[in-house]
A protein has these predicted regions:
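N-terminal leader/linker segments that precede catalytic domains of diphosphate-processing enzymes
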Residues: 2-359
Length: 359
C-alpha cells in the first residue's frame, strides 16, 4: 500500500517459530511437534499424486457459547434491572498467519488471568499514551490509516497502528520495522533488541522513541486491517480492539519472554495452531505443562475470545495464509472496517450463547 493508502504489496515470506537459545529451541520444537501430532490437530496426509480439493466454504459461526468460566457473571449481569456496561479500553491485536502442513495457521499466545483477548489468543493489548508519539513511517501514512480505520482523529489512528506493532514485538518478538522502504530488521532476538523489548514491557521508553534512537521506522505496509472487536457487555474487563493481520517477516522467528524464574515454560507458551483445528473440535493449545489436564485438549471457545474463532473461520475459508492476506488487501481502502459485537442469544442445552453481529 502506498502512502496514500491506495494499494497493498504482497505479504512477506513466512517463517517458523523458534526460541532464543539451543535448549529452548529444542523444547519449542518438541512442543510444536507435539501440538501438530496431537490427534485433535492432525489431518490425514494426502496420498502421493493426490490433489487436495479446493477449500470448502465455512460459514461464520451463527452463535458462540459463553465460556463456562464466565457463565455465572453473564447470568448475574443479565438479571440486573439496570445493567451497567463498563467502558471498553482501546486496544490493538494482531493475527499472525502462515501456511502449515495442515493448512493455514494462527500464532496463538497463552496468558495467565482473564484478559479480554482470552487465556489463549492473539498477541495484543491496551493502547498507551506513548503509542501516540510521532515516528518515521514506511507505507500507509497516519492519514491513510485513519481513513481505513474509520477514525477522524489522526492521533488515534497512529496510536492503534503503533500499539499493534509494539504488542506484537512484546509478546512474540516479531518486529515490523526497518531502516527504509522495503527493509525489515532481520534478527530482533539480539541482546540489544531484547533490552528494548524489556524496556517496552516495563513501560520505559515507548516504541516510537526506541525507533527514533535507532534510526528506524514502522513498516506499516506489513499490517492489514481486519476488523474492530468490542467485548461482550457483561464482561468486567472489556476491549474495543482494532484487529490487524500480518505474516512473519523474513529472517525473524517468534519467541516468548519467560516470566522470572520460569524460563523452562517459555517454549510452550506460544504455538502455531491450524485454523481448522480451532473450529472443528477439541484442540491442543499452548500453555504451561499440564494446564489442559489429562486429555491435553480443550474446546477453543472455552479459552479464546470470539475474534480468534471468527478469524479462524475466515482463515480456513481462504484456504491459505497468502489468500487470506491478499483478500484483506483487495479494495481495502474502499471498504468500511467491520465492527464485531457479541449480542445475547439465549440459553440452549444448558449453555448461554452469544451471537456475533457486524455493523
Amino acid at each position: 500500500m502506498s502512502a496514500d493508502g491506495s494499494a497493498v504489496p504482497p505479504p512477506v515470506s513466512v517463517s517458523a517459530t523458534a526460541s532464543s537459545g539451543p535448549g529452548e529451541a529444542a523444547q519449542a520444537a518438541a512442543r510444536a511437534a507435539s501440538l501438530r501430532a496431537h490427534p485433535a490437530n492432525r489431518r490425514p496426509a494426502a496420498p502421493v499424486g493426490h490433489v487436495r480439493p479446493a477449500p470448502q466454504r465455512r460459514a461464520a459461526p451463527a452463535r458462540i457459547p459463553v465460556p463456562r468460566s464466565e457463565e455465572e457473571a453473564a447470568r448475574q449481569w443479565a438479571a440486573q434491572d439496570h445493567r451497567h456496561v463498563r467502558p471498553a479500553r482501546r486496544a490493538a491485536a494482531v493475527a499472525v498467519v502462515r501456511d502449515g502442513p495442515q493448512g493455514p495457521e494462527l500464532l496463538l499466545r497463552h496468558r495467565p488471568g482473564q484478559t479480554p483477548l482470552g487465556v489463549v489468543g492473539l498477541p495484543g493489548g491496551s493502547l498507551t499514551d506513548q503509542d501516540a508519539e510521532a515516528c518515521t513511517w514506511y507505507g500507509p501514512s497516519p492519514r491513510a490509516w485513519a481513513r481505513r480505520l474509520g477514525m477522524a482523529d489522526l492521533r488515534s489512528a497512529r496510536q492503534h497502528v503503533v500499539a499493534a506493532v509494539r504488542e506484537l514485538f512484546e509478546e512474540t518478538g516479531l518486529l515490523l520495522v526497518g531502516e527504509r522502504e522495503g527493509d525489515v530488521v532481520m534478527d530482533p532476538a539480539t541482546p540489544l533488541w531484547e533490552e528494548a523489548r524489556t524496556s517496552l514491557e516495563s513501560e520505559g521508553f515507548g516504541l516510537p522513541a526506541q525507533l527514533q534512537r535507532r534510526g528506524l521506522g514502522l513498516r506499516t505496509d506489513l499490517l492489514r486491517p481486519v476488523g474492530r472487536w468490542i467485548s461482550p457487555d457483561f464482561r468486567h474487563r472489556r476491549f474495543d480492539a482494532v484487529v490487524f493481520a500480518a505474516a512473519v517477516p523474513a529472517g525473524q522467528q517468534a519467541t516468548v519472554r519467560p516470566a522470572r524464574g520460569r524460563r523452562e515454560e517459555a517454549a510452550g507458551l506460544h504455538a502455531w495452531v491450524p485454523a481448522a483445528s480451532l473450529i472443528e473440535g477439541p484442540v491442543a493449545l499452548p500453555g504451561p505443562p499440564g494446564w489442559l489436564g489429562e486429555s491435553g485438549v480443550v474446546e477453543a471457545c472455552e479459552v479464546t475470545a470470539p475474534p480468534t474463532l471468527m478469524l479462524a473461520h475466515r482463515l480456513a475459508e481462504a484456504g491459505s495464509a497468502v489468500a487470506f492476506l491478499l483478500g484483506l488487501a483487495d479494495g481495502a481502502a474502499d471498504r468500511p472496517l467491520p465492527r464485531w459485537r457479541m449480542a445475547p442469544a439465549g440459553e440452549d442445552a444448558g449453555r448461554l450463547w452469544m451471537r456475533p453481529t457486524t455493523d
